[in-house]
Amino acid sequence: MESARENIDLQPGSSDPRSQPINLNHYATKKSVAESMLDVALFMSNAMRLKAVLEQGPSSHYYTTLVTLISLSLLLQVVIGVLLVVIARLNLNEVEKQWRLNQLNNAATILVFFTVVINVFITAFGAHKTGFLAARASRNPL
């Protein structure tokens, strides 16, 4: 026997909001907005890291490496943002543009991958001693 829950009426006139079909354009828009917020957060984080590294000055251990990696990450994020705007402006429903959209989407995905890898290295090179070990090292310098 099927329960009433399994027989959901997907007609647009249905009064139950749970039984309404999903508007895929609305879903994609909400997903894009959420991803954009994460992109902005990463951009702000990298800008703050760059500021901190520049304030420490060239005497810090990985100064040149961190400035280079953070700058490259920021540049890639700007390029990805421009690429995503171009992708959003092209109409997916036009068959002659679908191949180009697919290529642009692949390029954006590859650039995002490189950005993630670069940010892993930024985190690795930017790690500082914290907590117990940092307090012990400051009391007993080698």
UniProtKB/Swiss-Prot annotation:
Membrane topology: Multi-pass membrane protein
Pfam families recorded: Ninjurin
GO biological process: cell adhesion; nervous system development; neuron cell-cell adhesion; tissue regeneration
Positions of the UniProt region annotated as Helix alpha1: 25-37
Ranges in the topological domain labelled Extracellular: 1-60, 127-142
TM segment ranges: 61-92, 97-126
Record flagged with keyword tRNA processing: no
Effect of I110G: Promotes ability to mediate plasma membrane rupture. In mutant M9 + W99A; induces ability to mediate plama membrane rupture
Listed name of the protein: Ninjurin-2
Organism of provenance: Homo sapiens
Taxonomic placement: Eukaryota, Metazoa, Chordata, Craniata, Vertebrata
Name of the gene: NINJ2
